[in-house]
């Protein structure tokens, strides 16, 4: 699929479906297949010696899973709870069913950009592999952890789970609300009724709550003939990404984001699930006169990608920066972000994790 076509489809996903309505029969088939897949895999799911908490979503695209995982690992560590992380490792050079546990020699090409970023920011044990069950088993053979956090994997039902945290992009929410390929959803929104937490990344509470109320009305109508199955989606918890500085990829020098004009002319580059969010972060400094360049999520950057930006500073995401380290120059800067979680949520999350851990001891 060409980049232009992919962008055109994505625009329809987050507006009115338009011509994509022609694919509605495929969306119905996708929903049916998803139902049977979930039912089949759940019956044969694998449990482990420690609890598993899924951190995922029901929509395609960036919802902030990586900064969320990082924040949760730190929050658990402050409570004396050791977490390990398993991830798919998109873009990693892994053979089928191969699992790799990250170490100091890991590179983005070996293990994927997101797992490497999690490892660098937290220092926790991270195992990557397309088979998350095998990843958990490998992790537990070599490391003692109290709980495993799965970066994504909500639809990987072979992986037994004790708790689930669903992430929602507070600006895009559920897009047009339709399943693939008409919309961006991997599962029907009523799936959110079975998760433990609904964490909203950014956006306004008014906008998100309005969408959630509409969702509840749709779910209630669909399940009106099955009153015993009527559940409510968990109350949303709102979190915000915070960016305060830039870091030079070659030297480690830091610069406050509010002083970004000191870079002179610069371009912004992003190869993430939702590049617009990153560009808006930079625009929040009041600077708007810079060019933006979007690449597909998990894009494998090379030095050739940056030759067109001679004589300009290059500002990128931290996720992209871990892939550019081998050819870093003084012109390259990245913006680390931290997810600021409400203290009430952190307390509840850690308490629920501790409660489940007790059941395994």
From Swiss-Prot:
Q: What is its EC number?
A: 2.7.1.130
Q: From the Swiss-Prot or TrEMBL record, what is one GO molecular function term?
A: ATP binding
**Enzymatic class:** transferase
Name the chemical reaction catalysed here. a lipid A disaccharide + ATP = a lipid IVA + ADP + H(+)
Q: Which GO terms describe its biological process?
A: lipid A biosynthetic process; lipopolysaccharide core region biosynthetic process
Which residues lie in coiled coils?
none
Source superkingdom: Bacteria
Q: In which pathway does it act?
A: Glycolipid biosynthesis; lipid IV(A) biosynthesis; lipid IV(A) from (3R)-3-hydroxytetradecanoyl-[acyl-carrier-protein] and UDP-N-acetyl-alpha-D-glucosamine: step 6/6
Gene Ontology, cellular component aspect: plasma membrane
The keyword Transferase belongs to this UniProt entry's keyword annotation: yes
Q: Which InterPro entries match?
A: LpxK, P-loop_NTPase
Keywords on record: ATP-binding, Kinase, Lipid A biosynthesis, Lipid biosynthesis, Lipid metabolism, Nucleotide-binding, Transferase
Question: Which residues are noted in the entry as ATP-binding?
Answer: 59-66
**Mind telling me which Pfam families this protein's record contains?**
LpxK (PF02606)
| Annotated function | Transfers the gamma-phosphate of ATP to the 4'-position of a tetraacyldisaccharide 1-phosphate intermediate (termed DS-1-P) to form tetraacyldisaccharide 1,4'-bis-phosphate (lipid IVA).
Q: Which family does it belong to?
A: Belongs to the LpxK family.
What is the protein's given name? Tetraacyldisaccharide 4'-kinase
């Amino acid at each position: 699929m060409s980049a232009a076509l992919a962008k055109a489809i994505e625009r329809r996903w987050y507006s009115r479906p338009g011509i994509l309505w022609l694919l509605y029969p495929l969306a119905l088939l996708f929903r049916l297949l998803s139902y049977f897949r979930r039912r089949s895999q759940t019956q044969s799911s694998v449990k482990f010696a420690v609890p598993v908490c899924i951190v995922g979503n029901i929509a395609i695209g960036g919802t902030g899973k990586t900064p969320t995982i990082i924040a949760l690992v730190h929050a658990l560590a402050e409570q004396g709870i050791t977490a390990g992380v398993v991830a798919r490792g998109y873009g990693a050079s892994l053979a089928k069913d191969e699992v790799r546990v990250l170490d100091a020699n890991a590179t983005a090409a070996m293990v994927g950009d997101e797992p490497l970023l999690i490892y660098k920011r937290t220092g926790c044990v991270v195992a990557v592999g397309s088979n998350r069950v095998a990843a958990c088993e490998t992790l537990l053979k070599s490391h003692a952890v109290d709980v495993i956090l799965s970066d994504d994997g909500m639809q990987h039902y072979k992986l037994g789970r004790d708790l689930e945290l669903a992430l929602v992009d507070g600006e895009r929410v559920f897009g047009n609300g339709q399943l693939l390929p008409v919309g961006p959803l991997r599962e029907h929104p009523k799936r959110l009724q079975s998760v433990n937490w609904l964490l909203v990344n950014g956006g306004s509470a008014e906008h998100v709550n309005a969408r959630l109320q509409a969702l509840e009305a749709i779910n209630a109508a669909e399940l009106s003939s099955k009153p015993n199955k009527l559940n409510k989606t968990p109350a949303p918890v709102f979190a915000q990404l915070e960016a305060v500085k830039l870091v030079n990829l070659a030297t480690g020098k830091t610069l406050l984001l509010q002083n970004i004009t000191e870079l002179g002319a610069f371009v912004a580059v992003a190869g993430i699930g939702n590049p617009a969010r990153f560009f808006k972060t930079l625009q929040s400094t009041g600077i708007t006169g810079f060019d933006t360049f979007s690449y597909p999520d998990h894009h494998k950057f090379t030095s050739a990608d940056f030759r067109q930006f001679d004589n300009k500073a290059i500002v990128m995401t931290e996720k992209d920066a871990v892939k550019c380290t081998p050819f870093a120059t003084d012109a390259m800067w990245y913006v680390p972000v931290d997810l600021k979680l409400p203290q009430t949520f952190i307390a509840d999350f850690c308490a629920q994790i501790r409660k489940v851990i007790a059941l395994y001891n």
